[in-house]
Amino acid sequence: MADPQTRKPSEMVHRPLSSRKYDYGHLLVVGGSKYYAGAPLLNALAAYIAGVDVVTIAAPHRAADIAVSHSPDIIAYPLSGDVLGTEHLQEINSIIKRNVTAVLIGGGMGREKKSFDFVVELYNAHKNLPFIFDADALHCASRVDFSSKDLLIPNIKEFGLISSSDTPTQVSVKTTAFSIKSNLLVKGPVDYVSDGKRVKEIKDASGKAVYLAKGGTGDILAGVCASLIAQGLTPFDAACIGAAAVKHAGAALGKLHGPFYLPTDLLRVLPDSLVHELGK
């Protein structure tokens, strides 16, 4: 499996003429279930837009089938059953051997005990890889010994699953990141990013990004951050850039349409927002 070199944000837009597929990462998206089938697709589409060379989805068959039927860009491995479980470890381990450089896990996964057991075992089997924990995977985060290569993306409510504080502030987010020895992106009206040493607030001065508070936008944010990590950015840089780009895109749509847009509409404006943030 690949071990991407750490890149600077300034290196992400302009690539060497000698670049080949997989030089800028292979992201594995693991998630989905019978009734929550869209999250892995949103993860994958956002990840491609954010520049990663290859995205592979591993999901229960309904979620995988929906993903490939929606877009020919998607590679999806359909797994048996309605939810993820330890019986899928062998299949996913074989996928990871194919130059995977980061794993995004949790979107639409559901909260079955067997799914949580699967997440913990998968993480423990591949501690050399960056893992991005989002959504339902955060509900078993207390069972995982994270490291500085990982990123957790809780919303305000989910923050309480991993922190002794229910309220995200600069102090509480930095303290929690230090405690779990990893990176946090706490999303909300103000996003907080910390690696335990630094903390940064991501705000929208226009007030128009408020309409991001709808289902699906978090899956897009997770896909962007995971894509940047898979390409070689540090989790802290990836989280700062990803959060700022999605807020920028949300504000652009909000100025034009107010709350009247689909989460997938963010995908149309993300390229300009990413160029804006990566070009700083």
Residue positions per predicted region:
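Small-residue (G/A/S/T)-rich helix-start motifs and N-terminal tracts that mark the onset
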Residues: 1-130, 139-148, 161-280
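Non-cysteine beta-strand/loop elements that form the S-adenosyl-L-methionine
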Residues: 148-156
